[in-house]
Amino acid sequence: MQQEEDDYFQSEEFLDILGRYEQAASSGHTPYMDSDELVDVADYYMSQGKHQEATEATRLALELHPDAQDPVTMMADILFETQQWKDSILWLNRVLDNDPFDVQAWLNLADAQIQCDQFAEALDSAEYTLAIQPDNLHALLQKAYATSRQDRYQEASEIFAQYIERCPDDELALYHAAFNLCFLERFHEANDMLTRAEELSQGLSPEHLNICLQRSYTEARIGHMQEALDALERSKEFQDPYTKVDYNLLSGHVYLLFQHRDKALECFTKALANAEDHLHTMRTIAQVFMDCQDFLTASDILREIEEMAQRPEYEDTRAEAIKAICPAQAYCYYQTGHKDEFLHYLQMAIALNPKDTQIFFRDIFPKEARVEDYLYYANGLE
C-alpha cells in the first residue's frame, strides 16, 4: 500500500496535479480542482511532514466541494496525526456520521478520546469497533485501558488477559495490565508482567521508564527492597528533569514501605525542590503516606496544602487544589478516628468532588448508597 502511494506521488499524473496546485497557490490564485485531486495533494504533503500545507489543501477541498466526504476524512486524519485531539474528535464524528462502519475512524476516535480523558466515550467507540470486527486487537486493548481508567479494575484485568493471551509479547499491554493489577493489590502477578515487559523492551519501548518505575513499586510491595532499588537505578538513564521528580517520589515510596523514614523524607525533599507544581507534588507525597498506612502524616500534609492554597500565588489553582484534597482528607480523618473533622471534610468532598469521594468510600458505605447520601451513613458510624 505504501509503495503504491509512493509510486503514485512520482507519477506524471500526480506531478501534473501538484504542479497545477502549487503554481496557482504561488501566484495567489485559488485553483479550481476536483475534490479527489486536492485530497491527493494534501495526502502528499502529509507524507512529507508538511502539515500546514496539507491543511490548506484540505480546507480548499472542503470549500469547493462541501458535499464531498474525502476531504472530511482527510481533515480528521490530519488533526489526528498532529495530535489535535479535541478537534479530531469533532471531525472523526463527522466521518462516522457518513460511514458508521469505518473501523479506522472508530479506532482513531477511541484513541483521541483516551487522550482527552473521555474514557466512557472511548469505551463506547472501542465497543463499536468490536461489534464490526470482533477480532480487532487494537480495539480490545482500548477497551481494557478505558475500562481500567473508569476504576473497573477487575473487569479490566479480564480484558487485558484476553489481549495478552493473543499478544504475549506486547510490552505496552503488559505494563498497563500490571498497572491495573496494582489497584487490585495483585502485586506478584503485576511484578511478573513488568519483569517480562522490561525484558521485551530492552530500553527501546516508549514506556521503558515507566516500566522500570512501576516495577520498582511492585518489587517493594512484595518485599524485595534491593530489587526495587535496582529497578530505580535502571530507570536513571531514561530520565529528564520532569521524570526526576517521579523518580524521587517513587524512591521515597520504596524507602517508606521498608520503614526507612529518614531516607524517604530526603527523597521527598528532592522531589519538591525540582517540582514545578508544588501542590500537586505534595498531594502525591500525601498519597504515598496513605498507601503506607500513615494517615496522620498524610493528613498533616493535606492540611499544609490547604493552607498554602490560600496564598495569593495559588489563586488560579486554589479551587482545584481544595477539590482534590477533600476526599483524601476525609478518608484520613476517618482512619484516625477524628469524627468531627471527618464529617466536615466528607461534606465538602461530597459537594466538590463526588467522583473521588466514591472511590475512597465505596468499600466503607453500602454499595447501593448514593454519594450524596454518604453523610447520612457517616453519622451512623461508631
Task: List where the protein language model places each region.
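Canonical tetratricopeptide repeat
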Residues: M74, N108, Q142, H176, ...
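Short coil turns that delineate tetratricopeptide repeat
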Residues: P66, P100, P134, P168, ...
